[in-house]
Amino acid sequence: MILPDISRFIKKNITFRDESLFAQDLDINKFKLRTEIENRHVLVIGGAGTIGSSFITALVDYNPSSLVVVDTNENGLTELTRRLRSDGKIKLPKTYLTYPMSFASETFNKILDRYNFDIIANFAAHKHVRSEKDITSIEAMIDNNVFSAHALLEKLSSNPPKHFFCVSTDKAANPVNVMGVSKKLMENLIMSYSAEFKITTARFANVAFSNGSLLDGHINRLMQRQPISCPSDVKRFFVSPEESGQICLLACILGNSGDIFFPKLGEDQLVNFKDITENFFDFLGIQIEYCNSEKEAKGISIKNMKTGDFNKYPVNFFESDTSGEKLYEEFYEENDIVNLKSYRELGVITNSYKPKKEEIQADIFKLKQVFQNKFSDKSSIVAALSSIVKGFKHIETGKSLDQKM
């Protein structure tokens, strides 16, 4: 059986564009991109995920000399290699190496010592709001998004690449969840090094059908014949997987140190998850059976499994009520200086706060003290984060996405 063309669905029902949003910016800057990438040595951290692998797909068009990819997901690296090797339009450099490891490991540091990378892009990040369910999950997230990123920057400062990129998120603008504020801290961290070597980042929209996303979950639930659950009141900006890699490549190569890139998307381009879900079922030719609760949806699913009748598929639409959930999206804050003229479809925040490294070290010490206190809980770390990042207004409902299907 040939599976449906998800990329076609994305173009027709989510982004509503047949051509990449960044096609013109790529074309206008193609000579600059080729000059900076061709015959260069590249390291991609977290390259097995959707955004990292899309960055690689965009990058190899410009003929780098070597490509090293690091990710903790060994199976993901295997699939990345299979996909790249199986694509007749992709030409990998002769030196193409993948290593399943953490970028916080000593073995990884040996890779940095062994190779002289011209371009380094870091996509290793906790990206889910659900990662703030308790202090243990929050510590793991901040360890990855902040502490390990700090150690990497310290290591690179003695032998910096020409271009360093570290991915961020739209949720870093006026953050209301711990994931967003952890990325805001990461932005402050990289800005504190931006005078020493060239560092850029990008905030962008949801990546449609990215690994682990709600929409990707729809496919997994369908494959398992399990019911689907979807918020009815949440709207998001979306880019395609292809576009997610392209915005990161443009930011990495073309940006000035300290720049934060974001896509030019207007309020009229926000898309409701409920609309996407209904359109997806229509695209698949499956009728939805609307359910008022998860319990009802699971009961219908069990019945369907027994009868083998899946002509109507159980879907529970619900109003969002979990901690840290933002019902709208924004890419920049009120006092940001934004350049909307340099690129066709990209905006750039040019005046980001650049703290001193000593301030960042003090913030990290403060957070580690909270984590080391055995009596600390989620509220303790939220309070510490609120004192460090001004404007952080955490939305706490006492409910986590891990409590939902």
Which residues are covered by each model-predicted region?
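A short, basic/flexible loop-to-alpha-helix module at the beginning of a structural domain
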Residues: 16-40
